[in-house]
């Protein structure tokens, strides 16, 4: 006697609400695809966030009299071997006064953080002029000076709540710490200087290069924690929507502020 087995008998159709049967195999394939996507995202996080952060130095700032002075610069390029053409931040080591190619720094909790930010990259009109407004600093203002390549100051110590990127080409990026509600437009050299005379070797220096110098202050959180900061202007040229590449990479235009218990 010959017994015939139906090889498809194990695949019992599952009736969807819409009435279309979905086989067990199809469901398994869908679950596998979802697992691959989740695993890929986890790998991305591990490599670009956890692994990237552990590979970079952290610049530590200590408070004096309840205040700490953080010094940053953003450049149109950097001195790395892997992505030298990516726009990037540098952090000044307070002990050596040397510029460190990192975007990780630490500050004490509940301290006044005085930031000096040198902007060497060229101007890019903001896609949304909402980000021209200064938010989250003490007084919701910044103080701005701008210099040409000869050191001539053409804007002097201007304290303002707005750096209007639509009325003039004078903003290169933004410096934002969303977790504490801080949003600051980062001033740049003007349009003619941006077109012809930008710094070409990083870390940039004030000698022989046009730049903007911007100062502002904020109070660090009272609790310890790691707070992401980044540029929220989609100006990553050559990348989808301008938000990829250096805009989302640790060590370039995204970083972390580590708030430590004082």
Locations of regions flagged by a protein language model:
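Extracytoplasmic entry segments of secretory-pathway proteins
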Residues: 2-165, 177, 261-262
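Extracellular/periplasmic metallocenter environments
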Residues: 35, 42-50, 144-262
């Amino acid at each position: 006697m010959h017994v015939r087995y139906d090889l498809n008998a194990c695949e019992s159709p599952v009736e969807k609400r819409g009435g279309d049967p979905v086989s067990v195999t199809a469901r398994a394939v869908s679950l596998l695809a979802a697992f691959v996507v989740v695993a890929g995202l986890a790998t991305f996080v591990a490599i670009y966030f956890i692994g990237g952060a552990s590979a970079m130095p952290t610049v530590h700032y200590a408070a004096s009299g309840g205040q700490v002075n953080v010094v940053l610069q953003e450049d149109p390029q950097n001195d790395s071997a892997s992505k030298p053409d990516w726009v990037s931040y540098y952090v000044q080591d307070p002990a050596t006064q040397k510029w460190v190619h990192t975007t990780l720094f630490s500050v004490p909790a509940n301290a006044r953080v005085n930031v000096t930010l040198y902007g060497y990259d060229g101007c890019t009109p903001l896609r949304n002029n909402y980000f021209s407004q200064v938010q989250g600093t003490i007084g919701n203002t910044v103080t701005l000076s701008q210099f040409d390549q000869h050191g001539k100051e053409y804007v002097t110590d201007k304290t303002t709540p707005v750096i209007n990127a639509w009325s003039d080409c004078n903003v290169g990026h933004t410096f934002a710490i969303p977790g504490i509600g801080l949003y600051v437009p980062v001033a740049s050299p003007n349009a003619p200087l941006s077109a012809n005379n930008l710094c070409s070797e990083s870390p940039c220096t004030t000698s022989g290069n046009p730049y903007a110098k911007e100062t502002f202050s904020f109070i660090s959180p009272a609790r310890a924690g790691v707070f992401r900061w980044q540029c929220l202007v989609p100006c990553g040229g050559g990348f989808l929507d301008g938000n990829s590449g250096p805009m989302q990479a640790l060590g370039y235009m995204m970083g972390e502020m580590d708030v430590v218990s004082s």
